[in-house]
Curated annotation (Swiss-Prot):
This is RecBCD enzyme subunit RecD. In isolated subunit ATPase and 5'-3' helicase activity are inhibited by non-hydrolyzable ATP analogs and EDTA. After reacting with DNA bearing a Chi site the holoenzyme is disassembled and loses exonuclease activity, DNA unwinding and Chi-directed DNA cleavage; RecB remains complexed with ssDNA, which may prevent holoenzyme reassembly. High levels of Mg(2+) (13 mM MgCl(2+)) or incubation with DNase allow holoenzyme reassembly, suggesting it is DNA bound to RecB that prevents reassembly. It comes from Escherichia coli (strain K12). InterPro entries: AAA+_ATPase, Coronavir_polyprotein_1ab, P-loop_NTPase, RecD, RecD_N, RecD_N_sf, UvrD-like_helicase_C. The holoenzyme may undergo conformational shifts upon DNA binding: the nuclease domain of RecB may swing away from the DNA exit tunnel in RecC. When Chi DNA binds to the RecC tunnel the nuclease domain may then swing back to its original position (that seen in crystal structures), allowing it to nick the DNA 3' of the Chi site and then rotate to load RecA. At high Mg(2+) the nuclease domain may swing back more frequently, explaining differences seen in assays performed at high Mg(2+).
Length: 608
């Protein structure tokens, strides 16, 4: 009972959630107090995005869980956590259906353990080489990629994807991920020579799917494909939820192992946003013969929910290709492709390719220089970049009320074209397009520097400037931007989709740009959970790009403000970036890496 009291006190101090204590008492309330504590800490860490709880976090050392010290008197000094956990009916090695699984020195929730093994098996064992006519493939690639004296990593990535069942292509902004996939799909169709080749395109969010549709469409129009060949590439991408057949009001999906997807090739963009459970469900729904090509940026923020799947996969990218694979890729591309050393995680390494040249950001781009410096964790270089005369980046302080008002004025100017089109009652598609040109990004949800506070202040400020006209008894007004916060497959709206409230003669409706390019309007009363989105979190901005992005960092240090968060925000900007940040907060963020504890990288190398 003493431990239960300690756990409840931890809830009061917001060190645990009520859910964590409820889980611990339900599955291990009658067990040794140490097992109950481990269950609570495991549940807590899962809520923080971690896949497992290493036993080192339960031992009295510098890596121990912060709550451990306060509970030592209740559980006693344990000499062997592994022995204690396995003596419990709530824990097994995975050979019994227990709530918790101990695998090596890592403790898992049962479902997370199952998900992790599904993903590890897929990339380790299911992944295999595909036999190709190397002479024909080399000839096809030469026609699609210009001849170059230096190594063309886009061409290498295409060769990787065309010779493996599963491939992962990672690259920063402007490295040509979409161009690469357009060309490799063109090569695939040309080499299929009329054989069945059902291709599907998908991304985690509606915004990312719409961007993939637009950018891939542009890239494909530049390629030498016949009209018949072009028909074989889908005109639009869908969200992963839509692809898998999410059911209204249900967690069940239409497509799973018993009813797999009807496709031969699947391209998935923005793979860094895919959490471990979603990746597992996607893998379960794939037919045995399907090829899968994952695109993403390994340096971006990890998924909101548990895991950092793309990061764990790409942990082996720097190890390079095996010697045999490097020789094959050299033959296919006509240039020397360097080999790495060793054979660890060979199957996975031979399926990865990093795009290493940015075609968007040259040496004259402040955004590109800043993103690279942040990615290296080089605080001095970040400071130097801002001291140079780059015209596409600017840094502002937010130390006073005057600074805050100046930031609101700049936001008003940023949304200027949108507000002008709104006043001119332009067509909904033009208004939506204009809104997406500028975006305020926040690290936090609450407080004056968070999404909630900032959205309220912007609305008040715009009302004062007579740019919008809010009614006292309604949240709805002409031009209110909203973001969907919960999937509604019946309406075809998903988490992250953005709509604009407009009255076009039928009363106020909310207008959305759909992935297929069409515009759809919905009555406000029919919308699923949603929120105003003049400002959005950096997490929500993933999969989107804006001509001008403005990042606002809080005035105090907080664990969520990390290098990956700042890098992700900076790389949302296409042409201009505004950064509102205190020097100390920015430096601390760049020095702080996001940590997601999982066993996936270990499973790739050891095949446990």
């Amino acid at each position: 009972m003493k431990l239960q009291k300690q756990l409840l006190e931890a809830v009061e101090h917001k060190q645990l959630r009520p859910l964590d204590v409820q889980f611990a008492l339900t599955v291990a309330g009658d067990e040794h107090p140490a097992v109950t504590l481990a269950a609570a800490l495991l549940s807590h860490d899962a809520g923080e995005g971690h896949v497992c709880l290493p036993l080192s976090r339960l031992e009295n050392n510098e890596a121990s869980h912060p709550l451990l010290a306060t509970c030592v008197s209740e559980i006693g000094e344990l000499q062997n956590w592994e022995e204690c956990l396995l003596a419990s009916q709530a824990v097994s090695r995975g050979d019994e259906p227990t709530p918790m699984i101990l695998c090596g020195d890592r403790l898992y929730l049962n479902r997370m353990w199952c998900n992790e093994r599904t993903v590890a098996r897929f990339f380790n064992e299911v992944n295999h080489a595909i036999e190709v006519d190397e002479a024909l493939l080399a000839q096809t690639l030469d026609k699609l990629f210009p001849v170059s004296d230096e190594i063309n990593w886009q061409k290498v990535a295409a060769a990787v994807a065309l010779t493996r069942r599963i491939s992962v292509i990672s690259g920063g902004p402007g490295t040509g991920k979409t161009t690469t996939v357009a060309k490799l799909l063109a090569a695939l169709i040309q080499m299929a020579d009329g054989e069945r080749c059902r291709i599907r395109l998908a991304a985690p969010t509606g915004k990312a799917a719409a961007r993939l549709t637009e950018s891939l469409g542009k890239a494909l129009r530049q390629l030498p494909l016949t009209d018949e060949q072009k028909k074989r590439i889908p005109e639009d991408a869908s969200t992963l939820h839509r692809l898998l057949g999410a059911q209204p009001g249900s967690q069940r999906l239409r497509h799973h192992a018993g009813n797999p997807l009807h496709l031969d090739v699947l391209v998935v963009d923005e793979a860094s946003m895919i959490d471990l459970p979603m990746m597992s469900r996607l893998i379960d729904a794939l037919p045995d013969h399907a090829r899968v090509i994952f695109l993403g940026d390994r340096d971006q923020l990890a998924s909101v929910e548990a895991g950092a799947v793309l990061g764990d996969i790409c942990a082996y990218a720097n190890a390079g290709f095996t010697a045999e694979r490097a020789r094959q890729l050299s033959r296919l591309t006509g240039t020397h492709v360097p080999a790495g050393t060793g054979t660890e995680a060979a199957s996975l390494r031979d399926s990865l390719c990093l795009l290493q040249k940015s075609y968007r950001f040259g040496s004259d781009s402040g955004i590109g220089q800043l993103a690279a410096a942040i990615n290296r964790g080089d605080k001095t270089a970040v400071k130097t970049v801002f001291q140079q005369d780059f015209t596409d980046i600017e840094k502002r302080l937010l130390q006073s009320g005057e600074d805050y008002i100046a930031m609101l004025e700049e936001a008003l100017a940023g949304y200027g074209r949108y507000l002008d089109l709104l006043q001119a009652r332009a067509e909904p598609d033009l208004i939506i397009q204009a809104f997406n040109e500028y975006q305020l990004l926040c690290a936090l949800r609450e407080g004056p520097f968070g999404v909630a506070g900032l959205n309220e202040r912007i609305e008040q400020f715009m009302q004062q400037k007579r740019k919008i006209h809010r009614h006292p008894h309604s949240r709805w007004y002409e031009g209110r931007p909203v973001m969907i916060a919960r999937n509604d497959s019946a309406l075809g709206l998903f988490n992250g989709d953005i709509g604009i409230a407009l009255d076009r003669g039928q009363g106020t409706r909310v207008w959305f740009a759909m992935p297929d390019g069409n515009i759809k309007s919905v009555q406000p009363s029919r919308l699923p959970e949603h929120e105003t989105t003049w400002a959005m979190t950096v997490h929500k901005s993933q999969g989107s790009e804006f001509d001008h992005a403005a990042l606002i960092l809080p005035s105090q240090r907080t664990p969520v403000v990390t290098r990956e968060l700042v890098y992700t925000a900076v790389t949302r900007a296409r042409r201009r970036l505004s950064l509102y940040a205190d020097e100390r907060i920015l430096s601390a963020a760049i020095a702080t890496r996001t940590e997601r504890r999982s066993g996936l990288a270990a499973l790739f190398s050891s095949r446990e």
